[in-house]
Each structure stands twice: as C-alpha cells, then as structure tokens.
C-alpha cells in the first residue's frame, strides 16, 4: 500500500514537473535556481574557506539590499492587496515569518546568510562523517517557502508581474547559502563527492515549492486567502534574513565603501527590475 502511494505521488510530481518545464517562465526559474545553487556549491571545492569570505561579504550586502527592497516595495503591498478586508492578518503572518526564521536559524546555524562557523572550519573532526540533518532540513524548509510564492498567474497581480525579479532575488540569496553549505558539508564529510546529495536536496527545495504552488494547490491558495498569508510569511522571512545580512556585513558600524556600493547596487537593481 505504501509503495503504491509513493509511486502515485512520484508520478504526479513528475507530471507536474513536465508541465512546469513546458512553460518557459517556469523552466527558466527552475534552471536558474538549480544553476546558482549547484554552481555556488561547486565553487566551494576550489575556493578556500578564508578566501570565500572576501567575495561573500559584497555579494551578501548586494543580495540583502535587493531582497529588502523587493519585500517592502512589492511582496508586502501585494499581500495587503490580496486581503484588503483583513490587513492585520498579513501583519501576523509577517511576524510569524520573521520570528519563525529566527527559530530556523537555530537549526541552520545561519547558513542562509553565508555563515560557516569558525569552530566548524577549524575543528573538522567534530561531527566528522555525519550529515547535519537538522541543519539541512531547516535550509530545505526555508528554501521551499521561498519557492512557493513564485506563482505566475494573473490572479496574483504584482507578484506575477515581478516573477523574474523575485526569482533573481531568491537565486542571489541562495548563492552564498549554497557555498556555505557545501563548505560545511565538505569539512564534516571529508570528501567533496559526498557533498553533492545534500547540495542537490537544497537545490531542489525551491523548485518543488514552485511546482506545488503552481500546479498542485494554486486554486486552493487563491480562493482561500492562503496565498496572501504565504506572502506575509515569506515577507517576514525575507525581512529577517535581509536585515541580518546588512547588519552582519558591517558589525563594527563603520563606513565600508565596498559594502555601501554593493548595498546601493542591490537597492538600485531591485527598483529598476521590479
């Protein structure tokens, strides 16, 4: 019975993915998300941990500013427009997303914003040979939720119009996360070949979220108001991640010209493409 259910579910998801790829917008989104995660993860095989931080900080500042701007100017307003009679409910979902991300980061150890902790980098024998399943699960939940708001339908207004802008934001955000995850797994497992299964699971989380939202539960999401709640939840998630990134890239609170330039570039790009 269980095997039959698994086979039916697998065939259904496979059919959904086929429809997904036949749609150019969806095909592009899944290709970009897979490429950025797997590409950034592969880079960890050649870039030393110490040198990785040199290019991660400007990229983090850029992606943090981009995500923050996109959330404030488009995702939050659209969530409020979808629930005009109950705007406070959106606020509650934003709070749930913000503080829910705080709890997820206890498990993920901040991998979402490019963290590879000092003790993990310099004590590779601690936890060696073991996959950090809780960390990976937290990352998958985080990534799945981000993918689930990428709905391309006229009924979702600005979110659909800015589909590509949000896809780019998620992809930019996933690059440092994938690099940090691959680095941590390499230190834990001792072989980069053993990194790929975990990296692939992370890479697939957002595409699966997109497929389910667009081809499995779209009508239920739109008719019940749950899509507005989902937007609020992910908006809170994005606000937590983006503000954490922006503050952490300059913990000494001094003027840092490269960080400032990257932040302004992220702000400008989000305003230009959205």
Question: For the regions a protein language model found, what residue spans apply to each?
Answer:
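Intrinsically disordered, metal-sensing/regulatory segments
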Residues: 1-274
């Amino acid at each position: 019975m269980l095997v039959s259910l698994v086979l039916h579910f697998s065939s259904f998801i496979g059919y959904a993915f086929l429809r997904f790829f036949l749609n150019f917008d969806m095909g592009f989104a899944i290709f970009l998300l897979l490429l950025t995660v797997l590409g950034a993860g592969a880079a960890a095989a050649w870039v030393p941990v110490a040198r990785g931080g040199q290019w991660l900080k400007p990229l983090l500042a850029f992606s943090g500013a981009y995500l923050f701007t996109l959330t404030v100017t488009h995702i939050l307003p659209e969530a409020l427009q979808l629930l005009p009679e109950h705007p406070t409910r959106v606020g509650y979902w934003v709070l749930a997303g913000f503080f829910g991300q705080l709890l997820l980061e206890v498990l993920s150890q901040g991998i979402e914003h490019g963290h590879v902790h000092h003790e993990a980098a310099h004590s590779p024998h601690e936890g060696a040979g073991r996959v950090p399943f809780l960390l990976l699960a937290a990352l998958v939940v985080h990534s799945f939720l981000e993918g689930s708001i990428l709905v391309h339908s006229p009924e979702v207004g600005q979110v659909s119009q800015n589909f590509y802008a949000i896809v780019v934001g998620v992809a930019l955000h996933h690059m440092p996360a994938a690099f940090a995850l691959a680095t941590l797994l390499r230190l834990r497992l001792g072989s980069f070949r053993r990194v790929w299964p975990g990296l692939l699971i992370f890479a697939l989380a957002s595409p699966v979220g997109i497929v389910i939202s667009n081809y499995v539960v779209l009508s239920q999401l739109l008719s019940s108001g749950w899509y507005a709640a989902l937007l609020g939840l992910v908006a809170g998630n994005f606000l937590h991640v983006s503000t954490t990134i922006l503050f952490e890239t300059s913990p000494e609170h001094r003027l840092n010209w490269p960080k400032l330039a990257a932040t302004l570039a992220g702000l400008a790009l989000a305003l230009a493409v959205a």
